[in-house]
Amino acid sequence: MGIAAYFYDPIFVEIAAKLGFRVLWIEMEHAFITFAQAADLCRIASGTGMLTMIRISDNRRENVLKAAECGPDIIDLPMADTVQIVHEFIQHARFRPEGARGYFSVPRALDYGMVESLPQAQQKLNAELSLMIQIETAEAVQRTDELCAIPGVDVFLGPADLSSSLGVPGQTTHSKVVEAAQTCVKAARRHGKLIAVGSPLPDVQFWADQGVDILFCGNDVACLRIGAQSILKQASAAIQNRKASTSA
């Protein structure tokens, strides 16, 4: 079970961990988190026992490389619509011979250089870092089997953007979206991929039934909004009850 951080707040991360969330999604596609903040969130989450996933904005080398140096467990690439996009992602994120990741001896991802053998540590990181490609367009769904056949990547499903791409924006349980999602899940399973998904609460049961490996079901902004709404509703009801009893 995972939850997303859309802004930098260590307190939220600790609360999420204590509540039992096991994976922290650090959002850098839509939100304004910096790489320095992302690295801090990785440190904090790791200290609480949570896994971390950074979603970058695109597969430009500087984005992939800086995210990788933060030391997350997962890097997620949105809009991974073509094999070429995915191969470029791998090239930037993996050390040779699997990719062409730039040499940097002291990142958090390599324990700041406190390793017996840097080449061995790089190969260990190659094996441990999960690269997720986000399937969230009709184009990507059509290429699902081809994309899932690429070695060294796992799959993240984006039902919200997928619904828009399929012409039914916001209708994440529409038959078109469900059919596409199930196609992706089957392809991912066939190729031995891990599957993650970001889901609104009403859809959680559907995704749980699909047997996804990581289910993100909330974010910090939504938690603040829902909590504030609940407090306001209860306080307003108390005030209304007081007025009613006074007038009586």
Which positions does each model-derived feature cover?
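C-terminal helical cap(s) of enzyme catalytic domains, especially alpha/beta-barrels
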Residues: 41, 83-99, 169, 221-245
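Structural preference for beta-strand elements that scaffold enzyme active sites
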Residues: 2, 22-23, 51-53, 73-76, ...
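Conserved N-terminal beta1-alpha1 strand-loop-helix module at the mouth
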Residues: 1-52, 57-59, 91, 131, ...
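Catalytic cores of alpha/beta
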Residues: 14-18, 59-73, 77, 82-86, ...
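Glycine/Thr-rich beta-alpha phosphate-binding loop at enzyme active sites
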Residues: 159-176
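Short beta->alpha connector loops at strand-helix junctions that form conserved
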Residues: 27-29, 56, 77-80, 159, ...
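Alpha-helix-loop-beta-strand connector modules within alpha/beta enzyme cores
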Residues: 35-69, 91-99, 123-126, 173-195, ...
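Conserved anion-binding
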Residues: 62, 74-151, 161-164
